[in-house]
Structures are given as structure tokens and as C-alpha cells.
Amino acid sequence: MTEGAPIPKVLYGTAWKEERTEGLTALALQAGFRGIDTANQRKHYFEVAVGKAVQSAIAAGNVTRAELFLQSKFTFQGGQDHRLPYDPAAPVASQVQQSFRSSLEHFATDYLDSFVLHGPNSRGTLSPEDVEAWRAIEALAESGQARFIGVSNFTLEQLRQLLGLARVAPRFLQNRCYAKKGWDRAVRKLCAEHGVIYQGFSLLTANRAELDSAPFKALCKRMGRSSAELVFAFARQVGMLPLTGTSSAEHMRLDLAALEQSLEPADVDLIENLATP
């Protein structure tokens, strides 16, 4: 395996930023983020711009490639628009390879720290196409081109099925994380049992009502911290690798500082059960 950066405590998410992508990625790197999450899915990401920001930071001597943790994803055609990073007529395994090579070009690198299946092609059990994509991703790990591999937007049953068939175990699972669903508690538990690191995204935007509740606001006031700081501290304390996509330099600073914040067990329990009646 290629030696690279340690797995970071937080990832900067680059989705939904369009023409601001390069500038915000550069700002995140300047603020101290070393983990960058993107996808070769032009519908929601602008990976070329992410790559430009990374290359500029390296060229300026602000960071080295070895200090960066770069994560991209393969997205099936159903999750793409017309701007595909692969030949849609090619076999799925070839699509994975083409998407991966394109991501390498975007970052001007010869490896990725993490390469993730962006979501299954099926809603129920994993399909033959899902398995074919996973085998192609495993091959990238086996060749050393991807240091770690993982999946995203998987249900509990899909993750259980994958763990049963994987030759190379997934290192990461990335899901949107809802307080009203126990912060994906069952999936997090299965991840912990199998050494899979749970990456949580939309921790703030998916939980506005819960974070506006009286108990949580009282906790923020008592601790003198923002809702974002406490949510990211909570995420780290329960074993998550959180993503933040903030566009504010000040919030970037606070999100990084929150990683050192420690919560009392009772406060962790309060946040864990915010949506419990």
C-alpha cells in the first residue's frame, strides 16, 4: 500500500459548490483541513476545480501530497447527468476504472487515499452491477492505487451483504446522518463491529429541527459553543468521521477546533437521543 496521510479527524466536503468550489477548497486547505471529500459526479461536484485547488496549494508549498487525504467516488449512471466520466456503454468494471483514472488526472496524482462506491445501483439487495463495481474497486485497492476503499448511501442490510462478500473489507461507510433515525445508530454499530469507519454528512443541514430544540440550545448556552461545534464534537466522540461543507472561514476554524472539544457522557447521551420522544 502507498504510504500517505493518516486518516483525518474531519473531511471537508466539496459537494454543491459549483463555481465556488476551487476557492472554497483552497480556503479549507488554508484553514488547516487535510482531508478532502469529492466525487467524479459533475451533477453535484466540480472535481476538476477541487483538483485545481489542491494542485495550487501543493505548487505553492503550502502542503505536500503526502499530507493530504483525498477521497473520491464512483457514481453509477443513474446518479449522474449527461457529463459522464466514463463510457456508459462500457462494462461496469471499465466504468469504475475510467472514473478512477479521470479522478487521478484531476488531482495530478498516482493514487487516491480513499475511493468509494457512491451508492448502490439498486434499492434493495445489492445487484450484480453493485458487486461488479465493488470487485473493480477492490482491484484498485489490491493494486495499491487506492489506499482505502468504501461505500456510501448504504442501508444496514446492504452493508451486511457487502461485508459478507467483500474480498477487501471496506474501510469507510459514508451516510447522511439523521438525528431522527438515531444518527444511523444500527449502521454505526455494524461498522464498529467490523472495523469500518463511519463518515457522517449533512450532520447540521439534515437536523435543523433537533438542533433548534430547547434541550440542545440550552446545552450550547451552558457550554458556550455553537451548534456546529457541539455536533462535530459529538460525532467524533461516538466514533464518526464527520464531514463539513461550510463556506465560512470562521466556521472552518471552529469546526477544526471542535475536534478537541470533549463532552461529558450525559451530554453525549443528550445529543444521541435528541429525537427520542
Feature locations, PLM:
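Short, acidic/polar
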Residues: 17-29, 89-106, 157-160, 182-183
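Active-site mouth loops of central-metabolism enzymes
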Residues: 8-20, 82-94, 122-127
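Structural motif corresponding to the early beta-alpha repeats
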Residues: 66-93, 118
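Active-site groove signature of glycoside hydrolases
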Residues: 105-125
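A structural motif
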Residues: 33, 109-112, 146, 170
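Acidic (Asp/Glu)-rich catalytic clusters
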Residues: 2, 27-30, 51-69, 104-110, ...
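Beta/alpha (TIM)-barrel catalytic core signal, keyed to glycine-rich beta->alpha loops juxtaposed to Asp/Glu
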Residues: 119-277
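N-terminal binding-site loop/beta-alpha segment at the start of enzyme catalytic domains
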Residues: 1-72, 132, 136
